[in-house]
C-alpha cells in the first residue's frame, strides 16, 4: 500500500467572467505580461499548497497526480515541469502552455502527461493542444493527446473516463 493523492484545486480568485467559478488570473485582462506575472504568483500559491498537502498526508510527489481544467491545466503543466521533485503524472483538460520560452528555461522534470481538448472549444482554441504536444515532445516529456469531437469548453464523460484510465495506469491501480 502506498499513499496517493489526486490534486485538483480551484483557482484562488473568484472568476471575473463567471461568478460561480474560480480563476488563477483575471480572464478579462488580455495582456501577455499580466498573464505571465499572475501565473508566477499562482505557481507560488500552488507550490505552497502542494507542500502543505505532502506534509499533512506524508506523501511523496511521485504519488501525486496534477490535474486541471483550462487555467488549471496551464498551472498543472507549469508546476509539474518546474518542480524540483517529479510528480506521478499530469492530466490537463482544455488548456495551453502559458509561456513556452520561460517554461523551457525553468524545466526540471517531465512527468507523463495526458492532454484532452474539445474540437469545438470557444474559450481555449483546440490548436493549443497541438502546440502543447509539440512543446512537450521537444522537451522530452511523454505526452498523450485526445481531441474530442463536438466538445466545447467543458469536461465530457469520455474525457473523464480517459483521464481515470490514465491515472490508474500511472498509479498502478488495478
Regions inferred by a protein language model and the residue ranges of each:
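Serine-hydrolase catalytic machinery in alpha/beta-hydrolase-like enzymes
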Residues: 2-59, 63
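Flexible "cap/lid" loop of the alpha/beta hydrolase fold
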Residues: 18-27, 95-113
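Short beta-strand immediately N-terminal to the catalytic nucleophile in serine-hydrolase-like folds
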Residues: 66-68, 93, 116
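Gly/Ala-rich beta-loop-alpha elbow adjacent to hydrolase catalytic centers
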Residues: 68-72, 76
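Active-site signature of alpha/beta-hydrolase-fold catalytic machinery across serine-
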Residues: 78-82
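A conserved short beta-strand
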Residues: 85-97
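Short beta-strand/loop motif that positions the catalytic acidic residue
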Residues: 114-117, 121
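C-terminal catalytic histidine-bearing segment of alpha/beta-hydrolase fold enzymes
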Residues: 130-174
